[in-house]
């Protein structure tokens, strides 16, 4: 059974009663860094306290640029310091186009991880990043690989699961996934950013009820909590998907 993670970006986007609707989640992951800077640390601390009081393990995450080894090392030191001061048990290194376009992305990722480990050796470290630059040596410095698997078509998401989970450089025990919450696509309201229920028998019609059972991620991370484009699927279902806590219940039932 995977561990289920709820990623939080900003406290202000959360419903005042948000902790009443996180049943089934094992972990709440809170944004605490942006590059080499702390990110709304006081607000993050309040979210962390609320999540801890609700009995959840708490991780941190940050958007990281890691455009050079020196800068990545500084980012790693800052992130580790925040994990230490906020008592976080895991950290998600979120690295996207800036990192992927750098001259030596794999070396920069390693520099971040090594710097982070020096100060926070006991904190679980997730490579929550673009897929293309990932290799075996780089992933060896992280505890988990957590690619972003997004899409507004059920076939797109299924295809990305298949591709990301067939990366030869990643051991099965490190495989995780970050997925959308199933909120409605505002550009096409017949689509959603994620699908819980399979729509047919073919692989291309697989929702999370089938994909999680088939690919067995160690952690399944939902991005993100709170209001997005006027919708909060933590609190209110939509025409395609139920609220997140109910999604988790269905996934768990599908695995039993």
Outline where the language-model segments fall.
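Aromatic-lined carbohydrate-recognition surfaces of secreted/lumenal glycan-active proteins
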Residues: 1-11, 57-68, 109-136, 146-147, ...
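Glycoside hydrolase catalytic-domain groove-lining segments
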Residues: 38, 42-46, 150-189
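Short, acidic/polar
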Residues: 6-23, 69-84, 129-138, 157-158, ...
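Boundary/entry segment of secreted carbohydrate-active catalytic domains
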Residues: 1-34, 64, 126-130, 223-227
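Substrate-binding cleft of secreted/luminal carbohydrate-active enzymes
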Residues: 153-154, 177-256
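Active-site groove signature of glycoside hydrolases
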Residues: 29-34, 78-106, 218-224
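Acidic (Asp/Glu)-rich catalytic clusters
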Residues: 16-25, 39-57, 78-87, 135-141, ...
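Aromatic-lined substrate-binding rim segments of carbohydrate-active enzymes
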Residues: 29-30, 34-63, 101-125
């Amino acid at each position: 059974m995977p561990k289920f993670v709820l990623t939080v970006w900003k406290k202000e986007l959360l419903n005042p009663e948000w902790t009443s609707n996180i049943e089934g989640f094992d972990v709440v992951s809170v944004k605490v860094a942006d590059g080499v800077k702390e990110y709304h640390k006081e607000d993050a601390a309040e979210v962390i306290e609320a999540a801890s009081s609700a009995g959840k393990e708490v991780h941190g995450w940050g958007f990281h640029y890691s455009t050079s080894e020196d800068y990545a090392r500084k980012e790693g030191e800052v992130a580790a310091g925040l994990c230490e001061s906020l008592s976080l048990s895991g950290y998600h290194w979120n690295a996207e186009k800036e990192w992927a376009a750098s001259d030596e992305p794999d070396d920069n990722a390693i520099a971040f991880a090594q710097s982070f480990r020096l100060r926070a050796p006991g904190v679980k470290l997730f490579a929550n990043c673009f897929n293309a630059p990932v290799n075996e040596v780089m992933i060896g410095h992280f505890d988990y690989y957590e690619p972003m698997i997004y899409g507004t078509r059920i076939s797109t998401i299924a295809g990305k699961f298949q591709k990301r989970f067939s990366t030869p450089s990643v051991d099965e025990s490190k495989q995780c996934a970050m997925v959308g919450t199933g909120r409605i696509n505002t550009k096409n309201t017949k689509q959603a950013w994620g699908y819980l229920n399979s729509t047919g028998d073919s692989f291309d019609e697989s929702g999370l009820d089938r994909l999680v059972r088939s690919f067995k991620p160690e952690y399944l991370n939902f991005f993100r909590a709170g209001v997005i484009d006027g919708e909060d699927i933590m609190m209110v279902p939509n025409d395609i998907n139920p609220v997140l806590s109910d999604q988790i219940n269905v996934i768990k039932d599908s695995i039993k």
